[in-house]
């Protein structure tokens, strides 16, 4: 099982294009439907992206994820991400480059691979049955198909979900069963962060329920890296050790897409204080 090692994989997120997404995902501050107070911008400069990659690598990050708002990996976006990935590879930082750019076809994903992208992240988010309650502008089936396309393109797959949207335990189990089918090398696990501008209830999972979600994920995905992402600070505060004891072996380092995280050095110090060390390779 993945949790046997005391190594924690550190991954950082680079929000290269933020906000004004046409999709209506009720949990997402980047949706243009809800008027959330976030930074909105199009396409960071390639130089800035490479500099962020260098900085996070110095803190121990092995993964670097290029994230864009929007429904899909259309041609202009694909070209931009390919250029960014190629520039990072040329910098010879030893990073595992991940792209997270919405729905994508096989040819576009293959193009990213030829330009330096190692893996693609596309989360199922929740069960097929519950998904229409949180998004109406695209389907769960589209998400699953993009994950299948990622595997067909011979890219590594990251796929996970978000807990605390109002889903049942049955929904959580169905999500994990479908992730079992896909067998991603990494599954990002998020906890919903309540936001008064979003249409979901203003409630946060209790630490106990969140831990039960992690334990369940480890049971269904024994050989998958479980990466804790958004919501860990909101739910667990400064007592995050139980997450690692429950089977988490990957952490998103630093800030999230539109939410501040801890300073990277503080995350690293916290992990080391629990008796874990930053992984030094991706395997």
Swiss-Prot record:
- Top enzyme class: transferase
EC number(s) recorded for this UniProt protein: 2.8.1.6
**Cofactor(s) in the UniProt record:** [4Fe-4S] cluster; [2Fe-2S] cluster
Q: Which UniProt keywords apply?
A: 2Fe-2S, 4Fe-4S, Biotin biosynthesis, Iron, Iron-sulfur, Metal-binding, S-adenosyl-L-methionine, Transferase
Instruction: Give TM regions.
Output: none
Chain residues that bind [2Fe-2S] cluster:
65, 100, 225
* Gene Ontology molecular function, alphabetical: 2 iron, 2 sulfur cluster binding; 4 iron, 4 sulfur cluster binding; biotin synthase activity; iron ion binding
Cofactor: bound how, per the entry note?
Binds 1 [4Fe-4S] cluster. The cluster is coordinated with 3 cysteines and an exchangeable S-adenosyl-L-methionine. Binds 1 [2Fe-2S] cluster. The cluster is coordinated with 3 cysteines and 1 arginine.
Pathway named in the protein's UniProt entry = Cofactor biosynthesis; biotin biosynthesis; biotin from 7,8-diaminononanoate: step 2/2
Return the CDD domains for the record.
Answer: Radical_SAM (cd01335)
- Detail which positions bind [4Fe-4S] cluster: 21, 25, 28
* Start and end residues of each Radical SAM core domain: 3-232
Alphabetized Gene3D superfamilies for the sequence = Aldolase class I
Q: According to the lineage, what is the superkingdom? A: Bacteria
Q: What does this protein do?
A: Catalyzes the conversion of dethiobiotin (DTB) to biotin by the insertion of a sulfur atom into dethiobiotin via a radical-based mechanism.
Its subunit composition reads: Homodimer.
Q: Which PANTHER family match?
A: BIOTIN SYNTHASE (PTHR22976), BIOTIN SYNTHASE, MITOCHONDRIAL (PTHR22976:SF2)
Q: What is this protein called?
A: Biotin synthase
């Amino acid at each position: 099982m993945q949790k046997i090692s005391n190594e924690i994989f550190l991954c950082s997120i680079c929000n290269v294009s933020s906000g004004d997404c046409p999709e209506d995902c009720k949990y997402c501050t980047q949706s243009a439907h809800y008027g959330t107070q976030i930074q909105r911008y199009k396409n960071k400069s390639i130089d800035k992206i490479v500099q962020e990659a260098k900085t996070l690598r110095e803190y121990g990050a092995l993964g670097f994820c290029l994230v864009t708002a929007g429904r899909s990996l259309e041609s202009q976006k694909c070209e931009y991400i390919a250029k960014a990935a190629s520039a990072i590879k040329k910098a010879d930082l030893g990073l595992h480059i991940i792209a997270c750019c919405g729905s994508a076809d096989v040819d576009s994903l293959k193009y990213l691979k030829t330009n330096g992208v190692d893996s693609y992240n596309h989360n199922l988010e929740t069960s097929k049955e519950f998904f229409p309650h949180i998004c109406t502008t695209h389907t769960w089936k589209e998400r699953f198909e993009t994950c299948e396309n990622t595997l067909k393109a011979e890219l590594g797959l990251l796929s996970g979900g978000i807990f605390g949207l109002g889903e049942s335990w049955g929904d959580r189990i169905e999500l994990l069963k479908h992730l079992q089918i896909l067998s991603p090398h990494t599954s990002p696990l998020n906890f919903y962060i309540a936001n008064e501008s979003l249409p979901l209830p203003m409630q946060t999972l209790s630490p106990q329920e969140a831990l039960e979600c992690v334990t369940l994920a480890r049971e269904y995905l024994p050989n998958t890296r479980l990466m804790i992402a958004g919501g860990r600070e909101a739910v667990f505060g400064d007592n995050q050790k139980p997450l690692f004891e429950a089977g988490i072996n990957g952490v998103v380092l630093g800030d999230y897409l539109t939410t501040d995280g801890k300073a990277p050095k503080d995350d690293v110090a916290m992990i080391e204080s629990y008796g874990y060390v930053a992984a030094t390779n991706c395997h």
